[in-house]
Regions:
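Glycine-rich ThDP/TPP pyrophosphate-binding loop and its adjacent helix/strand module
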Residues: 1-105, 109-112, 281-352
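Thiamine diphosphate
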Residues: 3, 122-332
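Alpha-helical structural motif
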Residues: 26, 74, 91, 95, ...
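Flexible, glycine/charged-enriched surface loops at secondary-structure junctions
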Residues: 38-42, 89-93, 114-122, 166, ...
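Amphipathic, soluble alpha/beta structural segments
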Residues: 104-130
């Protein structure tokens, strides 16, 4: 609890985690306060360790406080509290027997159940997407050539206009800067600070927060400022974001877009020029999009938004403005508002 004192907006509370009534009332109060004040809480529940820390090492080999921890077993404490409040011992025993029978019955069902089919390992990696065909005007008459960074910006602007659940957040994407590449310029002014906002310099939070945002019906578009910075967020991407659909048997995919400016450009040096696609490609459960021109950027951004799965949008910095010799072909006329380019279909530009 002392740890949170350095964070002004976070409150801390310590409770006896082995005391059911104290824990219940404390958590009830915390939830009520959180909903009213919209602030985070850290609850430190002090609990005994009644079993081994790991199955590989017996606790009596490395602990001399076993008896003290056994005295803090929450179940006997709860039984005493119930008896002191007037609940008869016979009623408590009846509940215990019923719970034991329920657990025993479920255990027997598990023992008698057939072994899982290994082929199921490959099911529910992704939720089906409604976007399967290219639609709309890719090259509408009168459309001016537009650089890739602007097509990304315009795509998100249109998405936010059409979808009130769409949010955009990350490092420096808010009002004052609008992204270090101006990839979010004007969006906070148009849609407000409650939909376009800055985050702490914390990639684990930026990526991990998409799980909760998606669960409550928002569609987060988040940005990791440079591909080089994605590593602190990789744990959240790998263990939570990419696996939610599989672990829920297809019920709860994390619907989000993670924008990642990538690659060498200008004077980025070794800490702002990395290419991380080979690492990301080995994470099952995420879709990776890597546009090579501005028209694809807009069409793929629209498809990524309507895809119910997590999509990592790799945006090469060298193609953002096409200032490097040889990248001029990345500039295309801006596609129409209704243009959408499905994910998962390669564009063959050269065949040997």
């Amino acid at each position: 609890v002392d740890y949170v004192k350095g964070y002004g907006e976070i409150k801390g509370l310590e409770v006896a985690g082995n005391n059911f009534s104290e824990s219940y009332l404390a958590i009830q109060k915390v939830i009520k306060t959180m909903r009213k004040e919209r602030r985070p809480f850290l609850v430190h529940a002090n609990v005994p360790l009644l079993n081994h820390h790991t199955s590989g090492v017996r606790m009596e080999w490395y602990r001399d406080d076993l008896e003290e921890h056994q005295k803090r077993d929450p179940l006997p404490i709860l039984k005493n509290q119930l008896e002191e409040s007037g609940i008869k011992s016979s009623e408590i025993e009846k509940i215990e027997k019923q719970v034991f029978q329920n657990v025993k019955g479920d255990f027997n069902k598990a023992v008698q159940a057939a072994d899982p089919d290994p082929e199921e390992l490959f099911e529910n990696i992704f939720h089906p997407t409604p976007i399967t065909e290219e639609k709309g005007e890719r090259n509408p008459e009168g459309s001016a050539p537009t650089i890739m960074v602007d097509c990304a910006l315009l795509a998100i602007k249109e998405l936010m206009e059409d979808n009130p659940e769409c949010l955009l957040y990350g490092q420096d994407v808010g009002k004052r800067l609008g992204g270090v590449f101006r990839e979010a310029a004007t969006l906070a002014d148009i849609f407000g600070d409650n939909r376009v906002f800055n985050t702490p310099i914390q990639e684990a939070f930026i990526i991990g927060s998409t799980v909760g945002m998606s669960a409550v019906g928002c569609k987060p578009i988040v940005e990791v400022q440079f591909a080089d910075y994605i590593w602190p967020g990789l744990n959240q991407l790998f263990t939570e974001v990419s696996r939610s659909c599989y672990l829920s048997r297809g019920k709860w995919p994390v619907s989000c877009i993670i924008r990642v400016p990538i690659g060498a450009y200008g004077s980025g040096g070794p800490y702002h020029s990395s290419s991380v696609e080979s690492v990301l490609a080995n994470i099952r459960g995420i879709k990776i999009v890597y546009p090579s021109n501005s028209a694809d950027m807009k069409g793929l951004m629209k498809a990524a938004y309507h895809d119910p799965n997590p999509v990592v949008m790799l945006e090469h910095k060298g193609l953002y403005w096409s200032k490097i010799k040889g990248t001029e072909s990345a500039i295309c006329p801006e596609p129409a508002r209704d243009y959408i380019l499905p994910l998962g279909k390669g564009n063959v530009v050269l065949a040997a």
